[in-house]
Regions:
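FAD-site-proximal beta/loop scaffold in flavoenzymes
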Residues: 18
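Acidic/polar alpha-helix N-cap and adjacent early helical turns
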Residues: 136-145
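AMP-binding/adenylate-forming catalytic core of the ANL superfamily
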Residues: 2-6, 10-13, 25-110, 119-120, ...
Length: 145
């Protein structure tokens, strides 16, 4: 890839010193294989700490009945981003029980301040959860509330 079509600012931001900066966060295993684990652009900053949504989502998915999770940051005057989780799954999901479950597994800054239960999460054509759509819905709900 040489550039973004008709997007000179995005091209300048992504290409620096001949390298393409994708915004992906990866890890290398002991055999030298790389795995993409998150996106830097999805990272939240809450109280000055980096919070990776994927890390929080992985913990919340361990709760019985939770099939899907989207963790987003909502604007907060004090913390910068307020960590909010939206879950979907089977049966009756209790947000208080999920919150209690998270207390033993996540540090305070990473623990969601609010957990919402939705019937399903918005997805792309490739069946990926659309965090941005979740965030936009929550921000718009707050504006109209």
């Amino acid at each position: 890839m040489a550039y973004y079509w008709d997007m000179p600012e995005a091209t300048a931001k992504a290409f620096r010193n001949g390298w393409l900066h994708t915004g992906d966060i990866g890890v290398m295993d002991e055999d030298g294989f790389f795995y993409i684990v998150d996106r830097k652009n999805d990272m939240l900053i809450s109280g000055g700490y980096n919070v990776y949504p994927r890390e929080v989502e992985d913990v919340l998915k361990e709760f019985p009945g939770v099939a899907e999770v989207a963790v987003v940051g909502l604007p907060d005057e004090k913390w910068g981003d307020r960590v909010v989780a939206v879950v979907a799954g089977s049966g009756e999901l209790d947000s208080d029980a999920i919150m209690e479950f998270a207390k033993g597994r996540l540090s305070g800054v990473k623990r969601p301040k609010q957990i919402l239960v939705w019937p399903e999460l918005p997805k792309s054509g490739a069946n990926k959860i659309l965090r941005r759509s979740v965030r936009d819905t929550l921000v718009n709900e707050k504006r109209t509330a």
